[in-house]
From Swiss-Prot:
InterPro entries, A to Z: Restrct_endonuc-II-like, tRNA_endonuc-like_dom_sf, UPF0102_YraN-like
Assigned protein family: Belongs to the UPF0102 family.
Entry GO MF terms: nucleic acid binding
Residues spanning the membrane: none
Signal peptide limits: none
Protein's recorded name: UPF0102 protein Geob_1494
Domain of life of the organism encoding this protein: Bacteria
Pfam families registered for this protein in UniProt: UPF0102
Gene3D superfamilies: 3.40.1350.10
Amino acid sequence: MRGEGKNDNKTLGEVGEAIAVTFLKGLHFSILERNFRCKCGEIDIIARDGRTLVFVEVKTRKNTAFGVPQLAVTPFKQRQISKAALTWLAQKKMQDAAARFDVIAILQPDHAVPEIEHIKDAFDLAY
């Protein structure tokens, strides 16, 4: 049926984000917000690692047929995430907070244990 692939990708993305939240909590991160949206873009997870704010992009794939998940965090996507992060910081009046951008790449084959790669400081603030 037309459009099913998009729903499958959304479901896979939601599963990946849930896996990422559990993973980050296991590392003692505090989850502050999920799926922050603004006109500039979206941030999957906003967390705190000690005193550092962490803006996390989660990419989940069933396989590497189209490359490893983290390759989907293109320069364009980095700019969108950066703009959304600046918006979030301004809304919370936290512009001076220490922050970084992480990527969590998840390979989640059907009925298999997911492979998780956490890339800290994956990219710098992009304009």
